[in-house]
Amino acid sequence: MSLNFDFYTLFMEGLQSIEVFVALLGIIAAGLISVSLVSKIGAKVLPQPSESRVADFLPFDRLLSDGTTLRCSNGSYVRVFKIDGVDLTAAREEVIMSMFEARKSWIDNISSTQVNCRIYTIRERAELAENKSNFGNPWLEKVDGKWKESLTRVYKNDHYIILSVPDRKDAIKDLNTASQSTIANLNDYGIRVMYEDENSPAEQSPIYPFVRVLNPISKPKPKARKAVGFQLKELMTSEGIHFTGEEGIIKFFSGTKTKYVLTIGIRSSGDYMDEAMVSSLMSIDCEMTMLHSLVPLYTPKARAILMQQQKMATATSFSSGVVSQYSEALSAIEDSDADHQSLVQYSMNFLVKGDSLEEIEFAESEIQRICRLFSVTPVRENWIAQATFFNQFPGYDTCGRTYFYLSRIVALAVSFEQISTGLPRSDWGEGAITVFRTMTGSPYRFQFHITAGEAAVAHCCIVGPTGQGKTTLLTFLAGQAMRHEDLKVYFFDRHRGAEIFTRTVRGAYVGFSGERKNVSLNPFDTRDTRSNRDFLRNWLRSITMATDALSEREASRAVTTAFEYLRPEERKLKNLYKSCFSPTGSMRRELYRWINPEQYGNIFNADHDSLDLSGNRFVAFDFTEIFDDDVLAAASISYIMHRIQSESTETGSPALIMIDETAPMLKHEMFRDNFIKGLQEGRKKRQAYLCAFQQPNIVDTLGVGDAVRGQCKTMIFFRNTQATPESYEKWNLTASEYDFIEGRTYRDCPYAILLKRPDADDGRGESVILDVNLGGLGPYLKLYNSSIKNVLLVESLIREYGEEAFVTKYLEGFGG
């Protein structure tokens, strides 16, 4: 037993200044009582390196009749718990502290039961569920396939707690007490005891986590059933294992496949440890098991250890401060109030896994890099790799690098972090819109909807400065959403940003004026319904701004005349102009410009309205020039929004209404009124409005801040290095969320976004950082390019090769 008497980090800081964001862990070498037993572990308790029948050395004997308790060969008892975990990535400080105190209380409470505890965090590749898709477009199918290929290396972290108690009087009673404390203290983490009966799935069996670490290749899922002794051990091991002795490498083999495992321990650390270190380690691009071994010591035993060490320090130390620090530690374990802490015997190890030596060496280098950022020194375990491997199982309780810590310190190391996973379905149908990676490498199933329930709110607001990729993300999400075959997408565009993608999916890119005009409009060329009649009356009043009683009667007479006295081909505004409006009335005077060819007469007087919303699944409207004319903008917006609402009402099909660069459009009263109405009523029509802004406070300047924040239950924030706290003040961000926006965190992921849903998860909220780097699309990323240079290139390719062939030529670089 070796000693280091610089106790300030371990005890004094642990008692006085627990910070959860940048937390004092005080682990390993910088001020601790260490019990380093590396030199004391021999082959007498472990199989020889050449052995491959690991079943011979497993401790398990049987699963008891309660379906939850394992009995070991040495008479000890084991109980296993699954922890769902919580996402505290952007939680508020009071929530983080509350969850931290729950973990600390759990450790303190089980100290009186004198049980051994192991915590597994098993990080394995996640297989993405087959995502329903019926795009109806070959290019969308190819994009989706390419995106799936880029997500082959995504991971899931699973947490397990394993309690074990040696064969002694009241062993089961102590195990039950510890189990009750574990469930009570960690209830908010989503904890459940693992249980097996005839009908339960194998993943719920108490043997399942042990099977996972024993079989990293084949990943079988056996059940214990009534297997006893060696039969149970054989059942749990389907793979061979070889402790090579070659620089600590362990080999698993199953058939022709081999998996390499490397064990890494913690040799020393600096004074401070951020919880972010553990989070970063469990985000590395590799499979691994993080093993925490802890034995919370019963107070009399802890007291005896500390008093003995204090006496030794008195005799050997030249510093009176060292002795007083022991007194502080003794005070902590004796305290009966909130300052009480238990003394814990603790170790942390990593077992990294890979299909090649290169993979595990990469993982080792990443662990080294991350740990050293936090002044921690990891070490590859060589000849004690075998011991570290067997430390995963009850009965093998002699750890290679074991240290004493106070419970607050250990509680910081075992955070049970679990990043949000998104939703598998929405009101629009089965499957996610798309899947993104989180910062831990786990898959996140993106939906616009806040829940999977029927008619859930799906409105979304995107905030980010220019040049961050908002248009690219919008068009990508629009295309991915078209996996729902009945979905209609309406994209309000400016400066032709979505034109390339629209033409790729064979959608309609609609221009209303000038050289880009390609549609003929006639609001009266429509079915005779009450809704259409009401709209036309209101539309006539809005484009003339005539509100007097005579104008009201004239508008009603014109609509009645159109549907009851004119043939369909005669229903035009110019045919109603003289017959329905008084020469001396204000409405006739104001309507003149809408029939005069020199003004707006050619806009809404077509023989046939060619704006086809029923035959096109993707329609983009180019509003670049329309907004240069306030009068034309109001008339056009109101008509288009009416057509969209009518289509949704008549078909019942879901609709995605995407408004790129929303702020300039909201300056127009007619658009603003329709936009707010859509946010308020769109949910009932299965509509999702997506709006995008460059500045976070522009919505308040435009007078729609409360409506946007209140109705857009999904918020996406791009980074903004020029951000000020004042500009984001009304978005109710946490400190860590704002740190991300300002660019202080996740700097190694330049294409990350913050997805925030304050009302998700039954009001508990959701906040997750997603990697939206679309580089995995390869050449298909060009389909989302919004630069005018590429738009003009596509225009020329269409003229030369036609609508059918231009995409291939464009992707091949023709004309570039």
Labelled PLM ranges:
Residues 2-421:
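Extended, folded cores of ATP/NTP-driven motor/assembly subunits in large transport
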Residues 77, 159, 488, 617, ...:
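The start of beta-strands in P-loop NTPase/AAA+ ATPase cores
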Residues 81, 619-621, 657:
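Hydrophobic positions in the central parallel beta-sheet of the AAA+
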Residues 87-89, 118-133, 140, 147-154, ...:
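Switch/coupling segment of Walker-type NTPase motor domains
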Residues 187, 372, 482-483, 503, ...:
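Anion (oxyanion) recognition and catalysis
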Residues 422-449:
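N-terminal pre-Walker A segment at the start of P-loop NTPase domains
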Residues 442-443, 448-480, 486-498, 508-516, ...:
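Conserved P-loop NTPase motor cores
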Residues 533, 548, 561-624, 631-650, ...:
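Conserved P-loop NTPase motor module
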